[in-house]
């Protein structure tokens, strides 16, 4: 398994990601993201794409992130409409990160694939920080019980006002992903 990220991702891998996303979220599901929307989301910037592939370059899992401005996030937060989100890419200075989607093929769940993606993501964030690209705040929305576990245990995010009794809803991380990066890389640096 290896991780491919950002601009290294070609159209074939992107199509595999869309296919896997649609296996989990079919068109009749309220969380379905249309193919045209996913392409539009990354047409100007592939910052935030982290794909795990096998030895034959077949996608086995992914994490997608986007960078938004405050007005765009607020519009999404108020409407609940995923399609209003616009990926502006990571810019020098402060950035708002939206942790978008993650998925691992069923046969690879529990294999450590998501942890490897997380390490690649954390390493990339640290590299960007050194170049003057900062994450000032991160947001995510948990739409499944597994998503709740990811945002609370994996990212250690705090619930926002709309989180319901099951944990579904929006979460925030105000430290700019610093603790997450440390956690993901601590066992590598031992």
Q: Where do the model's predicted regions map?
A:
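Conserved long hydrophobic alpha-helices within structured protein cores
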Residues: 58-73, 113-120
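Short amphipathic alpha-helix that is part of the acyltransferase structural core
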Residues: 1-61, 67
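Short, solvent-exposed loop/turn segments that connect beta-strands within catalytic domains
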Residues: 55-58, 72, 131-134
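Conserved acetyl-CoA-binding loop-helix of GNAT-fold acetyltransferases
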Residues: 104, 110-126
